[in-house]
């Protein structure tokens, strides 16, 4: 079976590697253009492009696939490459470009998407972050037959995984990437013998995982500790849950909900205790959060005890207050 692969980040690279290991022929890879990255802001190829080049696969990096859009020459060149590949199917995983109808219609078996949620819950760009942020007990991967809508196509395969209280977006991402890679191989093997049975998504339970905005990273200490703790986990590794002390920026990478209730006369964001277990901070609804791993601007992630050696804090200080 000939497979065009469209994807960009590490999540997609894992799937591409699994397809190649399973023996599928991949004549063409579509991925986002190289972007500036790192401290030197040098152009960097996506993980999927790096993988494709290592395996000697042709790569196309159009700015758009819309023939009537802003970059018609890019789209026309991509169309020629896609048609020349004579693929049976296109596999899409976190590609980052909208696929026009002509793309969906070109492969014999259409386009299959690896989506990191249990559809129809968390359609959209950030399903892993939003599942953790919402406190979901489970998530998973759905292999979907793509249509013109936003993650609205028929479901082909689905598998669940539990979200543990310790999961961050980073750990859950890696687990779902492996799951997605395994499921897409199973889906294509089933498709080769006509064994896939499309199931329409239910009309109930639709939610949208909107793209993460960096502005969301600011911790609102008026929220209950449980809500803040979920956001800390959801925003690891990006954008990181952030607060301030005066003019100094601080990121919180790990925390624990303290079962002890706090005095209600303490201001939300006020540091109530500092000990070997971390920094106790007053939160909304009379709750208490213990910060255990922190980072100051330009620094490294550090356990609270090490962080405090270079950034002294004291009970009574208020995090997130205007300088």
Swiss-Prot record:
Designated name of the protein:
Methionyl-tRNA formyltransferase
Does Protein biosynthesis appear among the keywords? yes
**Which top EC class is named for this enzyme in its record?**
transferase
List the GO terms this entry assigns under cellular component, sorted alphabetically.
cytosol
Against PANTHER family, the record matches this protein to: METHIONYL-TRNA FORMYLTRANSFERASE, METHIONYL-TRNA FORMYLTRANSFERASE, MITOCHONDRIAL
Reactions catalysed, semicolon-separated, are: L-methionyl-tRNA(fMet) + (6R)-10-formyltetrahydrofolate = N-formyl-L-methionyl-tRNA(fMet) + (6S)-5,6,7,8-tetrahydrofolate + H(+)
Keyword terms of this UniProt record: Protein biosynthesis, Transferase
Chain's gene name? fmt
Binding-site list for (6S)-5,6,7,8-tetrahydrofolate: 117-120
Report the domain of life of the source organism: Bacteria
Under SUPFAM superfamilies, the record lists: FMT C-terminal domain-like, Formyltransferase
> InterPro entries from the entry?
Fmt, Formyl_trans_C, Formyl_trans_C_sf, Formyl_transf_N, Formyl_transf_N_sf, Formyl_transferase-like_C_sf, GART_AS, Met-tRNA-FMT_C
Summarizing the function annotation, the protein's role is: Attaches a formyl group to the free amino group of methionyl-tRNA(fMet). The formyl group appears to play a dual role in the initiator identity of N-formylmethionyl-tRNA by promoting its recognition by IF2 and preventing the misappropriation of this tRNA by the elongation apparatus.
Q: What is the originating organism of this protein?
A: Acidovorax sp. (strain JS42)
Instruction: Decide whether keyword rRNA-binding is in the record.
Output: no
List, alphabetically, the PROSITE patterns matched: GART
Could you tell me one molecular function GO term of this UniProt entry?
Answer: methionyl-tRNA formyltransferase activity
Q: Which NCBIfam families match?
A: fmt
Q: Cite the CDD domains for this sequence.
A: FMT_core_Met-tRNA-FMT_N, Met_tRNA_FMT_C
- Transmembrane regions: none
**Signal peptide as annotated in the record:** none
State its Enzyme Commission number(s).
2.1.2.9
Family, according to the entry, reads as follows: Belongs to the Fmt family.
